[in-house]
A protein has these predicted regions:
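Charge-dense, low-complexity intrinsically disordered segments
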Residues: 54, 130, 156
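Charge-patterned, long linear interaction tracts outside catalytic cores
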Residues: 151-181
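Polybasic low-complexity intrinsically disordered regions
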Residues: 1-93
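Catalytic-loop motifs flanking and including active-site residues across diverse enzymes
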Residues: 59, 135, 139, 162-165, ...
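Helix-centered, glycine/charged polyanion-binding patches within enzymatic domains
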Residues: 80-148, 153
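Residue-level detector of flexible, active-site-proximal loop/helix-junction positions
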Residues: 51, 105-106, 158
């Protein structure tokens, strides 16, 4: 499937989404979600805007394909939301090494007399590289707090994307200036 077709299939209408916070409370928001792919140095490379209810894993393959067309990278570092075989295979198909935090589905460990298959764990080298993933959290935080991404007061996906991309542009310039110091 082509990149254009993959991006066209992603919903871009305004809707409502909910998730459970780390403290167990439901959080709700209405609108859109900006998915970013970030390189070393906290430089945004690719961005895709979708409906708020789109799960991050649905955007992983188009976003990785878009980024692969723009830069040469060695690793795809992702959190446990992206722990799916299709995403890992696509990353390898692009010539990247996927480093994904293993998903802990079911959350509770069961005591069994006969041990089954051990859950996948990151190697020490993968854990070291995975620490770089906190970079995207800092980029998202700066985009929201410093560059107007928290409250966008326009309607329509095109206008929202334009406002967010102005923030991403300024964030990129600011980050490049920090790196050159």
């Amino acid at each position: 499937m082509t990149l254009t077709k993959m991006l066209e299939e992603l919903p871009r209408h305004c809707d409502i989404c909910a998730k459970k916070s780390s403290k167990g409370h439901q959080q709700y928001w209405r609108g859109y979600k900006l998915h970013l792919d970030v390189a070393d140095g906290q430089i945004p490379i690719s961005a895709v805007l979708t409906s708020a209810s789109v799960h991050d894993s649905q955007v992983a393959i188009p976003l990785a394909t878009l980024t692969a067309q723009r830069v040469t990278s060695l690793y795809d570092v992702m959190d446990s939301a992206y722990d799916a075989q299709e995403i890992l295979e696509h990353s390898r198909g692009l010539g990247h090494v996927p480093i994904v935090d293993p998903a802990h589905r079911g959350r509770k460990t069961k005591n069994v007399i006969v041990p089954g298959k051990q859950p996948r764990q990151l190697t020490w080298a993968e854990e070291k590289r995975f620490q770089e993933r906190t970079m995207i959290e800092r980029v998202n935080g700066r985009l929201k707090d410093e560059f107007g991404g928290r409250f966008v007061r326009v309607r329509g996906a095109v206008k929202v994307m334009a406002h967010l991309m102005f923030g991403v542009l300024v964030l990129t310039v600011d980050q490049r200036m920090r790196l050159s110091e």
